[in-house]
């Protein structure tokens, strides 16, 4: 109902703002009225800004969070994928540096018989975006209409596209407002934003990769676990099977950061090679996707099946098929030189010998953004060729003059700024770290004991 209605029971945004300000629980109808009114343009930015700040300061109950997610979800189209016989499972990461697991997981799970309708995003802040990585593949089209998206799922079992205008329009409006009103960080608003988009895909189950550490948005494990529990419970309230893995982002995942470079590393993993940490996390997440997708009785069986699909080449062939169906050049899989390539390289060396004790992972991500691999402003275009290859991981021995990284660049001033950040991000200590951080810290969800 329009807020200007003269009915004695008319919805009034100011009443909802006051209740949230005073920490009084809102009903589902009140939250729905606010979301619908704002999406239609009946409620102005300044009132919704006030409500968002009240949410940041007062928080939300679990029923309120679920109601907000539901209202945002139903502000647009919810895909009907019931014609697909396979169970529909997606994976979502909260964002990290070098996090290219989606490009491995979609074809890998599809090769196992799970349908993967993946609607992804672009880079945010210091973190890379799945769409930017895919668009490093010449010709790859992420802007497919829903009809074509559904057709690709039937043919290939997986498809990876960007958010369409029809999906969760309330989220697009609310996110743009949060971005300029200091209200991005609320776990309740983050949960509703993520879950409304994911549930609009028409999925049966969802695997969440919630990052924690210096390169994550959630720096502490406590904050990451709170967000994970919130998203799992919200999804379960809406009838979906959801599991969340709290995973480490104190150093970049894999060795390559930058869009075209990360595609190279994805192909390496799908060939059964690539960095150990990236392979390990991909198999862990794939194990969960296959288990929730009903093609593996346990996560362990799902991991074993995934490893066999990689070893046999079936996962790589499914990736090749997806690339070709979405207009990309499939020859990049066997000829990496067909991917965009930077004109210059620069070695990054340390002036101290010892062990790589820790890494400010966010700085590495920011260095890649500075090179042009991400956006410093919303209107910036991304250079797919630039990036960083790390030659050392935390705990490795480092000697003076030995390269710890190579920068791939097209602008020397940007490369020098990036070099300084990479050097500053690496702490060299006299002794090796006492213990190696585990990649998966915790698993949250009703299915968490499915190993």
What are these regions (language model features)?
Residues 57, 103-117, 197-202, 237-238, ...:
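Alpha-helix C-terminal capping segments
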Residues 119, 153, 161-164, 194, ...:
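Short beta-strand segments
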Residues 133-159, 229-235, 239:
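A glycine-rich helix N-cap at a beta->alpha junction
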